[in-house]
Amino acid sequence: MLIIGIAGGTGSGKTTVVRKIIESLPAGEVVLLPQDSYYKDSSHVPVEERQNINFDHPDAFEWSLLSRHVAMLREGKSIEQPTYSYLTCTRQPETIHIAPREVIIIEGILALCDKKLRSMMDLKIFVDADPDERLIRVIQRDVVERGRTAEAVMERYTRILKP
């Protein structure tokens, strides 16, 4: 089994790299664990306050669950991967059944941040891109896929992502 970690800033092209890796391997041999699926549940936080959560900080993730799931897959056990809604900024009750495969890809902005998780990886990739190009990609993605306004994306970029 090969475990690959792919990290990089928001809009850097991580998803494109993941897609190219998956396309280059035989069908059915790869399982993708998006780090976003492991955001801590914030359903207890009032809706208006969820917009103030820094989802690009290591504290936003449930590292212990992600590490446990990777270990289980490595042991040949299936997992129930959490699901996350960008629209409500909460973990959803539904899970996705994931069976072990020959290649596990862990993808996310901070996928290489946690020491325990990083030690499980056989290959670590950091994707970098021009900041202006990243901003354009983030605006395009977040407006279409996540229901945000361009103004909200720009505000988040200047307040959280750029610094």
What residues fall within each predicted segment?
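ATP-dependent NMP and nucleoside kinases share a basic, alpha-helical "lid"
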Residues: 92-146
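Post-Walker A alpha-helix
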Residues: 17-18
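The conserved Walker
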Residues: 10
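Conserved nucleotide-sensing/catalytic segment adjacent to the nucleotide-binding pocket
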Residues: 31-34, 40-88, 103
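Conserved lysine of the Walker
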Residues: 14
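Post-Walker A helix-loop "phosphate-sensing" segment adjacent to the P-loop in P-loop NTPases
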Residues: 23-31
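Small-molecule kinase domains that catalyze NTP-dependent phosphoryl transfer to phosphate-bearing small molecules
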Residues: 144-163
